[in-house]
Swiss-Prot record:
GO biological process, one term: translation
Zinc recorded as keyword: yes
Required co-factors: Zn(2+)
Any GO MF annotation of the entry: metal ion binding
Name of the protein described by the UniProt record: Large ribosomal subunit protein bL31
Biological function: Binds the 23S rRNA.
Pfam family for this entry, one: Ribosomal_L31
Subunit and partners: Part of the 50S ribosomal subunit.
Gene: rpmE
């Protein structure tokens, strides 16, 4: 194996936007990494996850514009 090809692997402090900090190891120089979210504040880990209802979007579209009727297709296609 070649020697001196790997970067230095040093102790690093990770600081989250919520104020949580923890220690890890990283090759990033400086010894400090700042992140926006961590496992203490991310919605997936905290259980405050918002579930998107795509079926509700279809129902809302049909409510606004109605379902398309078969007779309407023929009138549009022969309207030259």
């Amino acid at each position: 194996m070649k020697s001196d090809i790997h970067p230095a692997y040093e102790e690093t402090t990770v600081v989250c936007g919520c104020g949580n900090t923890f220690q890890t190891r990283s090759t990033k120089p400086g010894g400090r990494i700042v992140v926006e979210v961590c496992s203490q504040c991310h919605p997936f880990y905290t259980g405050k996850q918002k579930i998107l209802d795509s079926g509700g979007r279809v129902a809302r579209f049909e409510k606004r514009y109605g379902k398309r009727k078969v007779g309407a297709d023929k009138a549009v296609s022969t309207g030259k």
